[in-house]
Amino acid sequence: MAIKSYKPTSAGRRHQTCSTFEEITTSQPERSLVVKLKKTGGRNNFGRITSRHIGGGHKQKYRIIDFRRDKRDIPAKVASVEYDPYRSARIALLNYADGEKRYIIAPLDLKVGDTVVASTSADIKPGNALPIRSIPLGTIIHNIELKIGKGAQLARSAGTFAQLMAKEEKYAQVKLPSGEVRMVLMDCMATIGQVGNLDHENVSIGKAGRSRWLGKRPKVRGVAMNPVDHPHGGGEGRTSGGRHPVTPWGIPTKGYKTRTNKTSTRFIVKRRTK
């Protein structure tokens, strides 16, 4: 993937950059793997905002992605590499030998015509999925399960990868994109390689309206609000808030640790690096 810049024909265009989409091979998704999703606007079933700064955006269709890779020992050929509006990575359409079609997250260097397979004895090449116990130490992996059969939860966004560090008894140690080292059951599935679309992090939005197209609403600073809306609000003229930074609900923020001790804490070997 490469980044495309524009001539400064307007203030919004001046710093705007965009993907060239040169790796995309088709513009129409597979109809059998597409469903409609209604936008929530960040509201729950009571109509109350549970996720702030969400709303609007272009209408999108959700592509059903195979995160489980549970179709074992049947080879599949990559039919196309496509854009997915719901994620930063590209997706690849697989045509299995038995006629079934599925989408997967497209790893780096996966091309149309390549063959991939999910198997305990699969080759160590990008796109193949194996149980972690069958993967050699030091291998770059993505799409990692946390619970057997639940589907991949770790290292799924553009350009991310994890590394297999060690194996002991029924657990493997995996170094995650954040720097955290975590124990994962060795029977969990993982996919070989790094997620594609590496230049996603280099894209510059360029203007406020483009964020609105993506369904992102403005984030208003607390010091710009009234006292009724935020603990930092109010005051005569411009103020700094008058207290240590807090959320709208009065909880300390900007570095304050809010994570509660969970049962999964014991699986963290090394905390993430800042």
UniProtKB/Swiss-Prot annotation:
SMART domains: Ribosomal_L2, Ribosomal_L2_C
Keyword entries, A-Z: Ribonucleoprotein, Ribosomal protein, RNA-binding, rRNA-binding
UniProt region (Disordered), positions on chain: 223-258
Keyword Ribosomal protein: yes
Domain of life: Bacteria
A biological process from GO: cytoplasmic translation
Cellular component terms per the entry's GO annotation: large ribosomal subunit
GO terms assigned for molecular function: rRNA binding; structural constituent of ribosome; transferase activity
RNA-binding is among the record's keywords: yes
Cited InterPro entries: NA-bd_OB-fold (IPR012340), Rib_uL2_dom2 (IPR014722), Ribosomal_uL2 (IPR002171), Ribosomal_uL2_bac/org-type (IPR005880), Ribosomal_uL2_C (IPR022669), Ribosomal_uL2_CS (IPR022671), Ribosomal_uL2_dom3 (IPR014726), Ribosomal_uL2_RNA-bd_dom (IPR022666)
Pfam family, one: Ribosomal_L2
Family: Belongs to the universal ribosomal protein uL2 family.
UniProt cross-references to HAMAP family, sorted A to Z: Ribosomal_uL2_B (MF_01320_B)
PANTHER family: LARGE RIBOSOMAL SUBUNIT PROTEIN UL2M, RIBOSOMAL PROTEIN L2
Function per UniProt: One of the primary rRNA binding proteins. Required for association of the 30S and 50S subunits to form the 70S ribosome, for tRNA binding and peptide bond formation. It has been suggested to have peptidyltransferase activity; this is somewhat controversial. Makes several contacts with the 16S rRNA in the 70S ribosome.
Subunit comment: Part of the 50S ribosomal subunit. Forms a bridge to the 30S subunit in the 70S ribosome.
Protein name stated in the entry: Large ribosomal subunit protein uL2
